[in-house]
Design a protein with these regions (language model features):
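Prokaryote-biased recognition of long, low-complexity C-terminal linker/tail segments
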Residues: 15, 177-211
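Intrinsically disordered, low-complexity regulatory segments
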Residues: 1-187
């Protein structure tokens, strides 16, 4: 029975983008068939994100009234942060989520870019997909050569080894979010009308950071 289970189990490799997934397929030298959003062979599946698949929710996800910009609702400081799948990539998220939770997948190799942002991209997907009971290993490579990819897979560590990196990624994202949401709204509400009058524009939005 154990032998049968081992034969049936598969490893899932998840890259940050399709081009990198193709490099992993070449390095692994597996005979894959092309599926919708992933490659599959007898014992290996290779899939990919397309950059970020999940993002932090805007204030109106917490309360519809917060969609309207008002000084009375600032600062916006949620006790718990909400996340959502990005609309334009929801199809790929659904594919990846289904693969992550497939019963025949026992080991997940995290092959997103080796760095804080790559770690964050996968962690958000894992969080939203609600992955449970899988072995997760982090592939950390310096290039996408065949030799380096195979070394990274061979030396892959348990993903918990990168928990501190993930924590720093979450923290930075929350800081960017709070700065952007609060200061963009504050400055726009206070100075936007004056600037609009000077520029003879209908409306002026003052953007701070990457989130508004």
């Amino acid at each position: 029975m154990k032998g049968k289970r081992a034969f049936m189990s598969k490893s899932l490799f998840i890259a940050e983008k399709p081009s990198v997934a193709q490099e992993f397929a070449k390095a692994l030298k597996v005979n894959t068939s092309r599926k919708d959003g992933y490659l599959e062979s007898e014992n290996t599946i290779i899939t990919w994100c397309v950059g970020h698949l999940v993002t932090m929710s805007y204030p109106e996800a917490y309360d519809p009234a917060l969609k309207r910009w008002s000084l009375q609702t600032l600062p916006f400081l949620p006790k718990e942060f909400k996340y959502q799948v990005i609309d334009g990539v929801s199809k790929q998220f659904s594919i990846v989520s289904r693969l992550l939770n497939r019963p025949d997948i026992d080991t997940i190799y995290i092959c997103t870019d080796s760095g804080r942002e790559g770690e964050y991209i996968y962690r958000l997907v894992d969080q939203m997909a609600g992955v449970k009971g899988k072995t997760r290993k982090r592939v950390w490579i310096d290039s996408q050569t065949e030799e380096e990819i195979l070394r990274g897979i061979r030396e892959a560590k348990d993903w918990s080894e990168y928990d501190n990196l993930a924590a720093s990624a979450y923290l930075r994202a929350k800081e960017d979010y709070l700065m952007g949401i609060n200061f963009s709204r504050l400055l726009t509400l206070k100075y936007g009308p004056t600037i609009s009058a000077f520029l003879k524009a209908d409306r002026t939005v003052l953007s701070v950071g990457r989130v508004m």
